[in-house]
Amino acid sequence: MFKTILSLIFLPIRILFQFFRILSWAIRKGDHFYLEIPSSFSFDKRSFFVRVLVGKEDSPFLLDFLLGLKALSTVPGLKKISFQISNPEYGFGEVWNLCKAIESLNEKGIHTSGYCLGGGTKALLLLSHCKSRYASSASEFFPVLPSAEPFFFGGTAKKLGVGVEAYASGAFKAFGETFQRTSFSQPAKKNIESLLSDQKALLEEGFLKSSGLDLKILEEPILSAERLKKLGFLTDLLEEDQFEENYLFETYKKEKEDSKPDYRDLKPKGLRLYSKKKNFTYLSRPVPTVIVLPVQGNILPDLGREEEFRSRQVSFRYYQETFKELREDPRISAVVLEMNSPGGSALVSELLYREIKKLSEKKPVITYVLNVAASGGYYLACGTKEIHGTPYSVVGSIGAVMLRFEMKNLYEKLGIKKERIGFYPHRDILSEYGKLSTKSEQFLKREVLHSRDVFYSRVTEARKTSTKELEAKWGEGRVFLGETFRKAGFLDSCSSVLEILQKVKEDLKAEKIDVRYLPGTYNWKDFIQDMKPGLQSIGLNLPFWNGKNLKYNPNEVLYLSDIASDLSQ
């Protein structure tokens, strides 16, 4: 009410500003927009200290970038957009959303043109969705089709005298096999092969539909621009400066110095001006606020009192406090969780699930799986009203696992002995020295199966399925692509994030919504942690040591899928 009264008081001034916008737009409007698709997107914002220290500009948020593309599609008279495509460092979830946005521009009759100096499969997929495609005559592309080559340390562990005991809830929960074996078990291997096959099928469909490029061409490890031009994939070969400087000319070639451009340039300032002009209303009325909250990284076992955000990690206290604030803020009408987590601590997964359920009781909460919601990530999603994703999202891994390292033989090789004093039943579980008693083994198996049963109950409640159906086809640690999971009823749709926001707007029965991205702050602690020298073992998939030196308790039950995170990239 107060806002409406203020808008009435200042209405004459606001109308005057709107008049100037109309005049300025008449001068600034153009029919061509030049835009760089960045190589990375941010999930957090940098603190002032980090910005000063690093000095680099932050990468944009994916959501902001997509909303910008949507705004471009509404500009009257816009005929063409030239995209400078950097080689993507993000996952197929981001790429698919960008491809959908480019498709939407094409459908609106806006000609999209792309230029890429080089890159891999993702760069080619983005380029493929543009109507005109360009590269330098010197450009080379290095495509890699869906495949996997994981490390196995079973032989090394045996030589060192390290025993690895895995207690898994199903044959497909292959988390411990990396350390126990020299290859995957047949069930786990078959599941991964099926997922990779589905990924290839999606890529094949994407390339054929957008540009007609046969996926078999991408089996060649090096593709020159000359070859892609002969195949008809590239429209022409241009140097980068030609594309950057001559984008107002139809063919990106300026015949003469005084040649008249074919297009009129629309600058970012002009786009912002048009958006303000378009969104002007005589009366300022409140619109529903929709929060998009990124949930990014492994779910940590930390239950300390510290509430600070941790970059690329899901910490309990930070999200507990965030969910509480969202729950209690009357201005917020709905929440979308942007999920990118392979899981982690079973205990923290359950605690955060309960916090999400509390939030869901107050307002609509939806999960959007960008790249991965496996194990604990999917567990969290089950606390929301709906679960959506992309066809490329890696989902599932419904089950539990626990690892225990037995170091006695290694210690003895090094001349180290440990003596057990005052041990009681099951105390050996907390020791890495010696094998477990039969009773302790049975205890751990029961704990893992109990955690699995709780997980199953969360899924069956959220997705209205039976435990029998879940275990027979979709549980026991299996991983799937989003499209497969959607057909089985475990995702509500495979949609772009913009389509999900449109659905939220319709569900709220609102003409407009105010979409706000709510990232955490990457502060000096995160920066120093990232700068620490040491073993960065992400590439080796070592489960108890991540890039930030935060360890899982080896006696803790995990809802975690290490392979899912890799496959999503």
Give, region by region, the residue ranges found by the protein language model:
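STAS-typified acidic loop motif
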Residues: 8-11, 29-61, 288-315
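Conserved catalytic cores of soluble enzyme domains
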Residues: 84-225, 341-482, 506-507
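C-terminal alpha-helix plus adjacent terminal tail
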Residues: 2-16, 26-28, 201-208, 215-218, ...
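C-terminal long alpha-helix characteristic of the crotonase
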Residues: 160, 199, 203-211, 225, ...
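Intrinsic disorder and flexible/low-complexity segments
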Residues: 284-331, 519-569
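A short, well-ordered alpha-helical element
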Residues: 55-78, 309-332
